[in-house]
């Protein structure tokens, strides 16, 4: 029975997901339905956490909008996500960057990873 579930989950996985790590700046384009219209909405920020669970994988993106911190959790293989673009690679030494929630301004900056 579990082999059937694994096979179905494998078919649902997206193949075009770029490799990114915590600290990277990404732009996620998401399909949004407003009434009868369907349009793309971009959400650009820093990846602060990644949860690897196969089909149930997710990542958290944080940005500052009008001086207020906004975090959004995206399911990596969701059909709602149109594209994920890595804008900048960040050099961090931790897997979860929750400490950025308390930081503002220059102390919330992340060095760029070279190479």
Curated annotation (Swiss-Prot):
MF-aspect GO terms: structural constituent of ribosome
Entry keyword set: Ribonucleoprotein, Ribosomal protein
Record GO cellular component, one term: cytosolic large ribosomal subunit
GO biological process, one term: translation
Xref: Pfam families: Ribosomal_L19 (PF01245)
Family annotation (InterPro entries): Ribosomal_bL19, Ribosomal_bL19_CS, Ribosomal_bL19_sf, Translation_prot_SH3-like_sf
Homology family: Belongs to the bacterial ribosomal protein bL19 family.
UniProt-listed NCBIfam families: rplS_bact
Function: This protein is located at the 30S-50S ribosomal subunit interface and may play a role in the structure and function of the aminoacyl-tRNA binding site.
Protein name per its UniProtKB record: Large ribosomal subunit protein bL19
